[in-house]
Amino acid sequence: MIIAGTVIGAGMLANPTATSGVWFAGSLVVLLYTWFSMLSSGLMILEVNTHYPHGASFDTMVKDLLGPAWNVINGVAVAFVLYLLTYAYIFVGGDLTAKGIGSAVGGEISLTVGQLVFFGILAFCVWASARLVDRFTSILIGGMVLTFIWATGGLIADAKMPVLFDTQAPTGTSYWIYVATALPVCLASFGFHGNVSSLLKYFKGDAPKVAKSLWAGTLIALVIYVLWQIAIQGNLPRSEFAPVIAAEGQVSVLIETLSKFAQTGNMDKVLTLFSYMAIATSFLGVTLGLFDYIADIFKWNDSISGRTKTAALTFLPPLISCLLFPTGFVTAIGYVGLAATIWTGIIPAMLLYRSRHKFGVGKNYKVYGGFWLMVWVFLFGIINIAAQILSQMELVPVFKG
């Protein structure tokens, strides 16, 4: 459940908007392509990890197999992504916590208090143990499934096939010209790679069990993403997405626009609850990966003293940044996907290639495929980097409804 919780973040709510250019059939292809590539790269990391002691993370593997230069590049990319995501989750989760507490007590609660409450409870879980994170995440995932079904069950049943499978692009154009803007968002929807080493440690080196959890967690996410696409793109016509795109996929605007074509009821409140649980599970998964990554770098053990030092370096920088600069890093967040592609696409393929030459296949696990899979994942990384750069420079078509 740690993998499913990490992958299924509140960002998935924006997937129908990000893929509105390629629409439903195109989004299925992009989601399947991204799911397979990201799962494969995660399994590559797992195989490489079997050659190292339990607890060894990216720092140990990249330094040993690719050298100090690549280790610096990878380390900066990993730290940038995980710290920035932690910052973002504290900010958004704290805001929702403050509003929830304020509504419950009938008063106004400051953002700072909300952030400290949200952070304190979840950070304690990560400091305590991966087992507690797993159990808490399982509860939250159950709540997410219930709220998701509650919010979208009727919409999925009422989905209209002519709307869902709309393929009438304007004359002389194609839906596929918008694929570059869809790829980076879908990649961000399948990020779990920082947790592979944590899971191998949690399962005491049982790599096949870790592989099963990666398959199960990412498949759960894929199914939920496809159902969400059906719920939205099966009811809201492609030609009516302009206000949603202008609002950058904001959930309230999406629901308001959708309500003109379908019964939405209390969907906004239910999706807010879903978002809150999704943010909490993502926070737990991301920070657990960051926690073990930092412990590996400094070789701090699992004693109370060691875990406390690791927790301090894991949580204090993003917490202090969030309290001092509650609206900062907005521009930097746009580059999270670019940095993540380095260590979720390019680095895993390089690691497996060097690992196979140095050690042979994994000790008790071998990822499917061979050299062709390494090339596939490496090219997946290159394609996503190109797509993100071209999209941010506005050198590719952008669908605006």
What spans do the regions from the language model cover?
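TM-loop-TM module centered on a large, flexible mid-protein loop between adjacent transmembrane helices
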Residues: 56-68, 221-279, 300
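Loop-to-transmembrane helix boundary motifs in multi-pass membrane proteins
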Residues: 108-117, 206, 216-224, 233, ...
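Helix-loop-helix junctions that connect adjacent transmembrane segments
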Residues: 108-117, 129-131, 135-249, 253-256, ...
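Extracellular loop-to-transmembrane helix junctions
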Residues: 16-47, 59, 220, 399-401
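Hydrophobic transmembrane alpha-helices that form the core helical bundles
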Residues: 40-106, 272-296
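Hydrophobic alpha-helical segments of multi-pass membrane transport proteins
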Residues: 145-154, 277-289, 313-317, 336-362
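Transmembrane alpha-helical segments of multi-pass small-molecule transport proteins
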Residues: 1-7, 76, 100-129, 144-151, ...
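A generic transmembrane alpha-helix motif of multi-pass inner-membrane proteins
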Residues: 327-401
